[in-house]
């Protein structure tokens, strides 16, 4: 860090051998402390700060919020041991031969020999136990294998039953679908048989029914003329009859002329046709 005015170094705190200085925050104990070997106490105006003497790890903290403690260093200084490469074995082969000659022969006691058969019997017991354990293990293994086989057979049977049931269900569903399809085909055939296609088109029928208006008017004129003739014939026949027909005074006798006039009023076309004749 650079300052416009260098601070005043009040004092320098250093640790003893095997110790270090721990600068810890008194307000926040969760913060890790600074472990250093020496600290400078500097002042900027009326405020004091702790500054690390080691410039590779600099820090500047207020002295009022931090405390300095001397803690034993956990590091162990190991000294390097130098290896002496010029070590030689004294005597060489001759020393080894002398050692073999000077060594006394071992004395065999009788007691250990007497105790040897007892010791020999002891290993037999573990062998029997091992055999029994091996038999038990084999028996357990056989039982386990049999159980496994039985479980496999049961699983195969259950799978076969399930597949058989599913196959039956599929067969029944297929049969029902086939029957429904057959019924639908029969119904469709009946519908087609009940409703045969028309022999003529609708346009042809309409064209046949349409008649010229001139022809219809001529037919109507002819029919009206025929009715007028028939009515006039009937009136003449009634007038020419021997029996006189007496009508009331209020009523007037109808004449052929009046009937013709009335018909002409109601049917002008017929009257014009009669005049032309």
Curated annotation (Swiss-Prot):
Organism, as annotated: Chlamydia pneumoniae
Protein name: Uncharacterized protein CPn_0623/CP_0124/CPj0623/CpB0649
Family, similarity comment: Belongs to the chlamydial CPn_0623/CT_504/TC_0791 family.
InterPro entries: GrgA_tf
NCBIfam families xref list: GrgA (NF045799)
UniProt feature, compositional bias: Basic and acidic residues: 127-145
Region (Disordered): 107-157, 245-277
Biased composition (Low complexity): 256-267
Highest taxon listed in the record's lineage: Bacteria
Composition bias, Basic residues: 146-156
